[in-house]
Amino acid sequence: AFWRSVFDDYESDEFMFEISVPLRNDLAKGKKVVLHLAEDPEVRDTLFCIDSDFDYLFADQTPVSREINRTPHIFHTYAYATENYLCYAPSLHNICVKATKNDTNIFDFEKFFADYSRTIYPLFLWYAYSAQQESEHIFTLADFRASVRLNFLEIEHNGLRTLAWLRRNVARRDQALRERHAEMIEPKRAFAEKLFRRGVTPENTYLF
């Protein structure tokens, strides 16, 4: 459905797109498979659509991101995955209105996600940088998820208490990582500047 919504605007009398996904569970999946298929001259009329993960952000700094970004008929998201777009903050109020038939605005999604993003940004940098360096053991995806998960959400005051609780958890983990891996602090700062040039800011981290 996501990629259909992308390509619908480009259909014409000359161009038509048919979106298909593997139907059998035994079909091979993954980026290596896509890259192998993309080299086949018999599928030159096929566009391969994938989640970026970090390949867009890494900007040719890893072998896979180089290959993905230089293959002309591979489309990938700027965000980590298509699901990130479903959480696009400016759209969430309208989704609630459609679901509840009630337009009362009791929660500012845009402010909350900006505040949430600023809160988790330090740990996002640790995880993304360690992933680019192929040192995921320093701060694994499981550790990152556990560190930024919201165990409760206070609707009143737009999640103020929730974010305060999360901020304390993030600060503790960030401090522990700084003490354990002090040699990564300066390179990580330069890495953050590269991410900024790719569109990542402390306020929109939730998309990536």
Language model features: what each stretch is:
Residues 1-208:
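Acidic, divalent-metal-binding catalytic cores of TOPRIM
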